[in-house]
Each structure stands twice: as structure tokens, then as C-alpha cells.
Curated annotation (Swiss-Prot):
Name of the protein in its database record: Probable ubiquitin-conjugating enzyme E2 W-B
Catalytic activity: S-ubiquitinyl-[E1 ubiquitin-activating enzyme]-L-cysteine + [E2 ubiquitin-conjugating enzyme]-L-cysteine = [E1 ubiquitin-activating enzyme]-L-cysteine + S-ubiquitinyl-[E2 ubiquitin-conjugating enzyme]-L-cysteine; S-ubiquitinyl-[E1 ubiquitin-activating enzyme]-L-cysteine + [acceptor protein]-N-terminal-amino acid = [E1 ubiquitin-activating enzyme]-L-cysteine + N-terminal-ubiquitinyl-[acceptor protein]
Keyword DNA damage: yes
Pathway in which this enzyme or protein is active: Protein modification; protein ubiquitination
UniProt family annotation: Belongs to the ubiquitin-conjugating enzyme family.
CDD domains the record matches: UBCc_UBE2W
Described function: Accepts ubiquitin from the E1 complex and catalyzes its covalent attachment to other proteins. Catalyzes monoubiquitination. Involved in degradation of misfolded chaperone substrate and DNA repair.
């Protein structure tokens, strides 16, 4: 537990002092707990999400960084994207099977920025309705199938 807290403190400071472009730590979210963070995000200029505001929820287990964080969009504005379900779940391999303890909150944020920035057309995944009705609340419990950068 102590190593997890030490690692999270280090990552928290890094996110506060040198956040990825368009991202800021929601300071209120970490006042009472180190294991759940909200990161505010603004869509990058020149993208289909330019100027839009989103929130990412990070939840860390006691096994972090050996276990990936649970990451999902939350709040009133979930991005419409082929890899983002309307309940906020994100189909991104580094959040599950491609996770490595060498990755960090910063690297997850950069991957999500990249994923959104490369989108040319706002649309939901084809199985959105079925998935949202039948999925587990924890996106890490989903068995994702990754095919050529699509889910």
C-alpha cells in the first residue's frame, strides 16, 4: 500500500506541475482521497472536439501501478467517439491488456488526447446501445477485442 501511495503522490505532483496540453487536475477531487481523481480536459484546437470540455475519472486499486487504473469519461459531456461508449467507458488497449507499470496517468492522458484528436467523425461505437445495457459498471471487467485500432 505504501508504494502505491508513494507512486500516486509522485504522479499527482507531475500532473499538477506539468499537465498534458488541455488537461488539468480537478483539485477538489483529491482533497479526501488519493485513489480517485478527476481530470478536466478541453478538446484540442483544430479537432472535431475543439473547445469542448470533458472530465476523466481515474480510480486506482491498491495494486497500482501493477494493475491499471480504471479510467472513464464522466459528467454531463461524454465525447461522441467510435471508441467511447455513451456511459463513458473507453475502448483503449493501454487501459487493460497493454497496461504496463512503466505507464502513468500522464501517458494515459496523452493517449486519450491522441485518440480524440485523430477522430474525423463524431459517432458512437456500433454496439453502443447493447454494450451500455449489458456491461459491468467497471470497464476493466469488459473483455475488449481490439482490431486495427477499433473496438
Amino acid at each position: 500500500m505504501a508504494s502505491m501511495q508513494k507512486r500516486l503522490q509522485k504522479e499527482l505532483l507531475a500532473l499538477q506541475n506539468d499537465p498534458p496540453p488541455g488537461m488539468t487536475l480537478n483539485e477538489k477531487s483529491v482533497q479526501n482521497t488519493i485513489t480517485q481523481w478527476i481530470v478536466d480536459m478541453e478538446g484540442a484546437s483544430g479537432t472535431v472536439y475543439e473547445g469542448e470540455k470533458f472530465q476523466l475519472l481515474f480510480k486506482f486499486s491498491s495494486r497500482y501501478p501493477f494493475d491499471s487504473p480504471q479510467v472513464m469519461f464522466t459528467g454531463d459531456n461524454i465525447p461522441v467517439h467510435p471508441h467511447v461508449y455513451s456511459n463513458g467507458h473507453i475502448c483503449l488497449s493501454i487501459l487493460t491488456e497493454d497496461w504496463s507499470p512503466a505507464l502513468s496517468v500522464q501517458s494515459v492522458c496523452l493517449s486519450i488526447i491522441s485518440m480524440l484528436s485523430s477522430c474525423k467523425e463524431k459517432r458512437r461505437p456500433p454496439d453502443n446501445s447493447f454494450y451500455v445495457r449489458t456491461c459491468n459498471k467497471n470497464p476493466k471487467k469488459t473483455k475488449w477485442w481490439y482490431h486495427d485500432d477499433t473496438c
